[in-house]
Curated annotation (Swiss-Prot):
Tagged with keyword Ribosomal protein: yes
Cited NCBIfam families: rpmF_bact
Taxonomic source organism: Sorangium cellulosum (strain So ce56)
MF-aspect GO terms: structural constituent of ribosome
Gene: rpmF
Keyword Ribonucleoprotein found: yes
Keywords: Ribonucleoprotein, Ribosomal protein
Family in the record: Belongs to the bacterial ribosomal protein bL32 family.
InterPro entries for this protein: Ribosomal_bL32, Ribosomal_bL32_bact, Ribosomal_zn-bd
Pfam families in the record: Ribosomal_L32p
Cellular component, GO annotation: large ribosomal subunit
Compositionally biased region (Basic residues): 1-10
Protein name stated in the entry: Large ribosomal subunit protein bL32
Lineage: Bacteria, Pseudomonadati, Myxococcota, Polyangia, Polyangiales
UniProt record, GO biological process: translation
SUPFAM superfamilies to which the protein is assigned, alphabetical: Zn-binding ribosomal proteins
Length: 64
């Protein structure tokens, strides 16, 4: 059975664990239609456009 030869120091242990719980910042791009910030590869929440065409209905268009 494999057994560690030396005790893992708290510093080494914490460095190993640090990458698992690391939070990466959200990357935002601007919508080509309205200029609102949106997530990449997602339809715009403000106007509903994605890839140059209307992808989903928004509250403003559904009300009219």
């Amino acid at each position: 059975m494999a057994v560690p030869k030396r005790k893992t120091t708290p510093s080494k242990r914490d460095m190993r664990r640090a990458n698992h719980d690391k939070v990466t910042p959200v990357q935002l791009v601007s919508c080509e239609n309205c200029g609102e910030a949106r997530l990449p590869h997602r339809a715009c929440g403000a106007c509903g456009h994605y890839n140059g065409r209307k992808a989903k209905a928004t509250k403003a268009t559904a009300a009219s």
